[in-house]
């Protein structure tokens, strides 16, 4: 792991647990169109990125622009909380201490990220945050180019199959973390370079191999 100098993190399910407000908001969108709510397990088994693939399956008749507006409205109204996942702040601190560059690449709304990261005390840890990346494969190459970083020295940490596919698309090392939306079985199908239970385990690997 000591060859990696650039750490790209996903947000939802990787650094934070935001499943509460995400599920609440999604269910309110579905209810608005007369659809049944998802249970937590149902949502995790069905949800996928890019968002369009998920909504095309269940609400193909509704324009994405309309869905995004409704989702944002309901998310802002949700009483559900967002929490830092175990090891999140610690791994960001260690990356800073070791002189590594840290980036965010997430589909989260820019304002939601700014609010959540400030409230959770981690907004200052990122060299740059790329938000509203609806298809991360389209964004990761731009991230590498913008910051003049080598894919050989870069890894991407995420909790979903789309994150692993994004890393592979850019030729960077992929880390699947099992604290988020996709199950271990789903992550294994994507064949990441490394699977960890949580960021505490990844931090231990970084500390012992740096």
Question: How should each PLM-predicted stretch be described?
Answer:
Residues 2-89:
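N-terminal helical cap/lid subdomain that shapes the substrate entry/recognition surface
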Residues 6, 138-164:
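Conserved Lys-Pro-Asp/Glu-containing loop-to-beta segment of HAD-superfamily phosphomonoesterases
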Residues 14, 106-108:
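Conserved phosphate-coupling serine/threonine residues in phosphotransfer and NTP-handling enzymes
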Residues 42, 122-136:
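A short, structured active-site edge motif that brings together acidic residues
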Residues 77-104, 114:
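Short, acidic loop-to-helix structural element flanking the phosphoryl-transfer center
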Residues 89-97, 144, 164-168:
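Surface-exposed amphipathic alpha-helices with a cationic face
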Residues 130-131, 194-198:
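Short acidic-hydrophobic, aromatic-tinged amphipathic segments that line or gate anion-handling sites
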Residues 156-194:
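Acidic, Mg2+-coordinating phosphoryl-transfer loop and its flanking beta/alpha structural elements
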């Amino acid at each position: 792991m000591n060859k990696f100098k650039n750490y790209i993190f996903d947000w939802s399910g990787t650094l934070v647990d935001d499943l509460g407000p995400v599920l609440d908001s999604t269910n309110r969108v579905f209810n608005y169109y007369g659809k049944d709510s998802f249970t937590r397990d149902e949502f995790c088994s069905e949800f996928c990125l890019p968002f369009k693939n998920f909504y095309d399956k269940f609400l193909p008749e509704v324009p994405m622009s309309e869905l995004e507006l409704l989702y944002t409205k309901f998310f802002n109204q949700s009483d559900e909380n967002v929490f830092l996942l175990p090891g999140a702040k610690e791994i960001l601190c260690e990356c800073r201490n070791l002189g590594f560059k840290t980036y965010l690449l997430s589909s989260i709304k820019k304002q939601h990220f700014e609010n959540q990261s400030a409230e959770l005390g981690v907004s200052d840890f990122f060299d740059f945050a790329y938000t509203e990346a609806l298809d991360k494969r389209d964004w990761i190459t731009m991230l590498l180019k913008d910051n003049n970083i080598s894919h050989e020295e870069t890894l991407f940490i995420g909790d979903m199959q789309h994150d692993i596919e994004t890393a592979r698309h850019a030729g960077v090392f992929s880390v699947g973390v099992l604290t988020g939306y996709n199950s271990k079985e789903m992550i294994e199908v994507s064949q990441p370079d490394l699977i960890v239970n949580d960021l505490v385990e990844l931090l231990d690997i970084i500390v012992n191999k740096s």
